[in-house]
């Protein structure tokens, strides 16, 4: 019997690394996909390569996109500052339609690979309030995937799996540690330096640090 395949979105951060480990533990052959989309730094792409290697991905693919050509986000437009204090509403670090774009490309690769499962590390508990991290979005994308693909209309449906959806950051970290994730390889910071060191001030850094503290696990994050 052939091993079931999964395409997994891997940013190089804590959440997506955990998802790779969870999929592997569930018996999937893992095909990881990252995006060089014009983000502020390349440290997360280097982290994604390290994580894919450590967790035994069958293939790690990096797709080039020019989302900074559109701008509209502090992560793709250097003229918009990354906030270093909590904010109300959807923060300026939201990248317009990013998860829709990423999942669409993962869907295409999954169809080529004849993989039925696509994993994404979105979370609706300890998160920044992005609309494309909500359960409603994941469910809607799965419906679209099965309407928009040859595989879907022929009855070989896709599943969009978001195993972290209802977990706290501490629970995510505990799940990853139990499955052998080396979080020292990951980068979560929105404005990490060239060595992957974190600022310790942005929303992503705060969520990460609070998660390690709540989990009672030492935080391996290097800071500048």
Swiss-Prot record:
Q: Which cofactor does it need?
A: Zn(2+)
Q: Name one GO biological process term.
A: queuosine biosynthetic process
- Does the keyword field hold Chloroplast? no
Q: Name one GO molecular function term.
A: ligase activity, forming carbon-nitrogen bonds
Q: Give the metabolic or biological pathway.
A: Purine metabolism; 7-cyano-7-deazaguanine biosynthesis
- Pfam families named among the record's database cross-references: QueC
The transmembrane segments are none
What are the record keywords, sorted? ATP-binding, Ligase, Metal-binding, Nucleotide-binding, Queuosine biosynthesis, Zinc
Q: Where does Zn(2+) bind?
A: 189, 199, 202, 205
Q: Which reaction does it catalyse?
A: 7-carboxy-7-deazaguanine + NH4(+) + ATP = 7-cyano-7-deazaguanine + ADP + phosphate + H2O + H(+)
Coiled coil (UniProt feature): none
User: According to the UniProt entry, what is the EC number of this protein?
Assistant: 6.3.4.20
Q: Which family does it belong to?
A: Belongs to the QueC family.
**HAMAP family attached to this UniProt entry:** QueC (MF_01633)
Q: What does this protein do?
A: Catalyzes the ATP-dependent conversion of 7-carboxy-7-deazaguanine (CDG) to 7-cyano-7-deazaguanine (preQ(0)).
**What is the name of the protein in this document?**
7-cyano-7-deazaguanine synthase
Q: Tell me the organism.
A: Pseudomonas paraeruginosa (strain DSM 24068 / PA7) (Pseudomonas aeruginosa (strain PA7))
């Amino acid at each position: 019997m052939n091993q079931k395949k999964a395409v997994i979105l891997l940013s190089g951060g804590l959440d997506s690394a955990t998802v790779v480990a969870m999929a592997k533990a569930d018996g999937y052959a893992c095909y990881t996909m990252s995006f060089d989309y014009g983000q502020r730094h390349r440290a997360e792409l280097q982290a994604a390569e390290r994580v894919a290697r450590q967790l035994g991905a069958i293939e790690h693919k990096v797709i080039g996109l020019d989302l900074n050509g559109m701008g509209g986000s502090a992560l793709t437009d250097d003229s918009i500052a990354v906030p270093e204090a909590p904010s109300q509403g959807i923060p300026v670090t939201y990248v317009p339609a990013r998860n829709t774009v990423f999942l669409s490309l993962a869907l295409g690769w999954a169809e080529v690979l004849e993989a039925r499962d696509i994993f994404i590390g979105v979370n609706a508990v300890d998160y920044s309030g992005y609309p494309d991290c909500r359960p409603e979005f994941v469910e809607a994308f799965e419906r679209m995937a099965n309407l928009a693909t040859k595989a879907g209309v022929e009855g070989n449906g896709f599943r969009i799996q978001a195993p972290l959806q209802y977990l706290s950051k501490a629970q995510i970290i505990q799940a990853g540690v139990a499955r052998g994730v080396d979080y020292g390889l990951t980068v979560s910071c929105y404005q990490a330096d060239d060595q992957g060191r974190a600022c310790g001030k942005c929303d992503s850094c705060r969520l990460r640090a609070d998660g390690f503290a709540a989990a009672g696990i030492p935080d391996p994050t290097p800071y500048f």
